[in-house]
Amino acid sequence: MNEVIKTMLDHRTTRSFVKGKELPKEHLEQIIASSKQGPSWMNGQHYSIIVTTGETKQQIADLIRDKAPGNAAHIENSAAFLLYCLDYTNIKLAFDIEGGEFDISNQHEPILIGTLDVGIAMQNAALAAESLGYGIVYCGGVRGFGDKISELLNIPENALFLCGLSIGVKDEELSTEKVKPRLPDAANVGYNEFPKSNVEVLKEYRQTMVDFAEERETKTWTKKFADFYAQPSGIEKVTKELLEKNGFVSEKER
């Protein structure tokens, strides 16, 4: 097994970082370069990366602390917190150069295209950081504070931040996370046809996760997601408002 695959298979979320550590400049540059080198739709690169450190990173942590103390803690203690934005501002500039009126608010594909580009870029950054020995944790919950964070970071129309990535030096004394079992292939891998998952497969995985006994989980895997998707999530309202405000959803779609 080569080192790239080993790093990928050894992935575990890290929420406990050694506070006060900074990323060496060359490591941050390597992580960003790796992130940007990922493939993107038509090479459109429909994303932006906001690197937050120091006071700005602290401001983000302070903004969310009351409602999301766990996320605030890992952001505060991380060496850097990278915010990834779905971004069509450069495409808007392309329209300015070539002529024509930029408006994607009546289209559905741009959101999917940009979200895919963001996901690929983020995973490249995560893999690069882990290959350098750092811990990482994705943070989608910051979308629940989208209006405040957008104002803090001057995120303009035609851009929308989707997710954050905390990177830092792992605090091995406090870290309890282990390599988490994934769904069996029967649930989500198919060869020449769609996978044939079933209730028994998911019941077995539910028991696998019970046996794994992650401390932070209070529900079984099936119960957690049956509850989560039974109604709109807590950040649905903020996400909808930002999609509308930032030009991703038209009046007709509303």
Q: PLM features: residue spans?
A:
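Acidic, surface-exposed loops and disordered segments
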Residues: 1-254
